[in-house]
Swiss-Prot record:
This is Casparian strip membrane protein 3. GO terms for cellular component: plasma membrane. Regulates membrane-cell wall junctions and localized cell wall deposition. Required for establishment of the Casparian strip membrane domain (CSD) and the subsequent formation of Casparian strips, a cell wall modification of the root endodermis that determines an apoplastic barrier between the intraorganismal apoplasm and the extraorganismal apoplasm and prevents lateral diffusion. Belongs to the Casparian strip membrane proteins (CASP) family. Keywords: Cell membrane, Cell wall biogenesis/degradation, Glycoprotein, Membrane, Transmembrane, Transmembrane helix. It comes from Vigna unguiculata. GO terms for biological process: cell wall organization. Homodimer and heterodimers. It is a multi-pass membrane protein. Its main location: membrane.
Length: 224
């Protein structure tokens, strides 16, 4: 009996069994490494999307199409303008055509050139829609629009002066008003001049819009 008791009492207790018992009782182990904590940042960095600049670029494209349509209409109407009176003599035929007047020739050329410049500027206007913060394309558009506006306003003003003389004449210079005979010719000419001035208004709006957007872009890019 004593030998059995001594055998039971002398049974060694291993460290692994102690750890197992301590784990069973819910105690933490000193040798265990603490779990790592991962910190996730929920801060969202806003990406620039253009905002009102993209809307301004879309409006620029629409105004550009309006200017192209008006200038094409002005050049086409003036370029096809002529009138032949129903009466004639043995030696004379009363006929008037747009190319009889140098100012009307310049009118057709200037509006046609403005149309070409505006059509070539359409891809750059699309680039401004895709990239609202681009500065280079907007600067190029402002330069093209100023040049086209100068052509259109000069042509419309010169043609308007001739149309005024055709309607009213000049007593001081003894110029008669030919519109009393060539009514259809003068009416079509007046319509072409009005269309050209409408194109000039579109171009002025384009220049103002592009200048404001360009100023904001330069301020954002360079701090000017």
């Amino acid at each position: 009996m004593e030998s059995k008791k001594e055998g039971v009492a002398s049974a060694p207790t291993s460290p692994e069994s102690r750890r197992t018992r301590s784990n069973g009782k819910g105690k933490t182990i000193a040798e265990a490494t603490p779990p790592s904590v991962t910190v996730v940042s929920t801060k969202v960095t806003p990406s620039p999307r253009g905002g009102w600049r993209k809307g301004a670029a879309i409006l620029d494209f629409i105004l550009r199409l309006g200017a192209i349509s008006s200038a094409i209409g002005a050049a086409a109407v003036m370029g096809n303008n002529e009138q032949i009176l129903p009466f004639f003599t043995q030696f004379f035929q009363f006929h008037v055509q747009w190319d009889d007047f140098p100012m009307f020739q310049f009118f057709v050329f200037a509006n046609g050139a403005a149309v070409v410049f505006l059509i070539l500027s359409l891809p750059f206007s699309i680039v401004c829609i895709v990239r609202p913060f681009a500065v280079g394309p907007r600067l190029l558009l402002v330069i093209v629009d100023i040049f086209a506006m100068a052509l259109v306003i000069a042509a419309a003003s010169a043609a308007a002066a001739v149309v005024y003389l055709a309607h009213n004449g000049s007593q001081d210079a003894n110029w008669i008003a030919i519109c009393q005979q060539y009514t259809d010719f003068c009416q079509v000419t007046s319509q072409a001049v009005v269309a050209s001035f409408v194109a000039a208004v579109f171009l002025i709006c384009l220049i103002v819009l592009s200048s404001v957007a360009l100023k904001k872009g330069l301020k954002r890019e360079f701090g000017w």
